[in-house]
């Protein structure tokens, strides 16, 4: 079975672990051999690139790297991002030079990933090709595909806390430096009008047996993916059912600041509102099925809805909720 998942960073990576456990892939599958040869299943993640940024002259792709490190068993378990057993000598030396930005941390081991990526970009390789090359080192047990090979970044219009004027900043500055604690007016997917979906991403959607929308941030993760021309169209025309998982439980996000992002775009922080925001595929949206938490209730015209436990407390519990979604869509793992 070919499973394609739309994901963001930390939450999306944990969701992918659950999919892998259900399918017997990656850390949960046979070792020393290609997983698809032994399980008959194939997992592709179409990953958000809206968080990507140039930092100290290097191209940093936070969500791609978080998925790669997590599935490759190299993530820092305390922080949930970056390398395990990281050191910070370069960061400390940059601080002594007074180099900005000083609010974005890059560890020494993590720098190697960004150096390789930047060198390959400068040599003319596409981000999709580079991601495949990086994954050769990590063996994540899934194919990681950027939503686009083009530059398409999420920017945020805020009121500057110093001079009280409106200005646009990169999402990373809003998220990491300000922790979303500044007056925020809108989000913009800069470059989307000139970007196109990666060929590999479109193919993964078109060829899938089922497509899962992870409970990632619906604005700056899934929303940023859907903003790329070609992605939404591929979701609407694929023959595979599209199953979404609510990132909101009892009015609060599973993780991160999805509620703050939803408020900015005028969407309530409820499972129903997010499902309606995505919309039914039989009208103009992307969903066939929508999974909400057992204490929530949702009715979305044209979408099959089921209430189940949605807390991703372990790969096993996540695998269970993935399996229920497949059953709702009429697909068997």
Curated annotation (Swiss-Prot):
7,8-didemethyl-8-hydroxy-5-deazariboflavin binds at residue 65. GO terms for molecular function: LPPG:FO 2-phospho-L-lactate transferase activity; magnesium ion binding. Its cofactor is Mg(2+). Gene3D superfamilies: CofD-like domain (1.10.8.240), CofD-like domains (3.40.50.10680). InterPro entries: CofD, CofD-like_dom_sf, FbiA/CofD. It catalyses: enolpyruvoyl-2-diphospho-5'-guanosine + 7,8-didemethyl-8-hydroxy-5-deazariboflavin = dehydro coenzyme F420-0 + GMP + H(+). Pathway: Cofactor biosynthesis; coenzyme F420 biosynthesis. The keyword Transferase applies. It is an enzyme of class 2 (transferase). Keywords: Magnesium, Transferase. Its EC number is 2.7.8.28. The keyword Transferase applies. GO terms for biological process: F420-0 metabolic process. Homodimer. HAMAP family: CofD. Belongs to the CofD family. Catalyzes the transfer of the phosphoenolpyruvate moiety from enoylpyruvoyl-2-diphospho-5'-guanosine (EPPG) to 7,8-didemethyl-8-hydroxy-5-deazariboflavin (FO) with the formation of dehydro coenzyme F420-0 and GMP. This is Phosphoenolpyruvate transferase. The lineage of its organism: Bacteria, Bacillati, Actinomycetota, Actinomycetes, Mycobacteriales.
